[in-house]
């Protein structure tokens, strides 16, 4: 679902994508780790394993790169308890000026996955979708310039 976004980012001379993941929800009767289907709106699911959604980018230290960085830093405003911006040390060692934006409950922000209740999973899904929508809008605006 984010392939077009990644393609658009690849067209920017001030940025390259290091890694990304859409974010996946696993639960009984849905154990495909590549699942991209929305969570069911109703059901008897008690707990959900969430595998984080994120995008890691390396940005050029240029005017365009700095402007894009400023916009990325604003993304957590969607929901700061579930959306973080920062620098992942293991990326920075190989790619200075690399940054990550991730959707993960704040209490688990240093983990790749976590188990949450169904209602929290629904909230995470909404935050993830808003994050990618806003990022796509941002990229589209830059693309038009």
Segments predicted by a language model, with ranges:
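Structured alpha/beta or helical-core interaction and ligand-binding surfaces enriched in interleaved
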Residues: 1-145
């Amino acid at each position: 679902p984010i392939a077009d976004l990644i393609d658009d980012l690849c067209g920017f001379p001030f940025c390259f994508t290091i890694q990304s993941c859409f974010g996946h929800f696993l639960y009984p009767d849905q154990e495909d780790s590549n699942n991209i289907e929305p969570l069911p709106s109703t059901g008897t699911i008690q707990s959900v394993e969430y595998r984080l959604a994120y995008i890691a980018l390396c940005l050029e230290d240029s005017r365009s790169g700095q402007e894009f960085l400023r916009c990325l830093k604003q993304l957590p405003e969607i929901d700061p308890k579930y959306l973080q911006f920062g620098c992942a040390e293991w990326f920075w060692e190989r790619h200075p000026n690399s940054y990550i934006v991730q959707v993960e409950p704040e209490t688990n922000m240093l983990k790749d996955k976590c188990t949450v209740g169904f209602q929290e999973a629904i909230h995470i899904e909404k935050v993830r979708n808003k994050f990618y929508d806003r990022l796509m809008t941002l990229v589209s605006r830059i693309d038009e310039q």
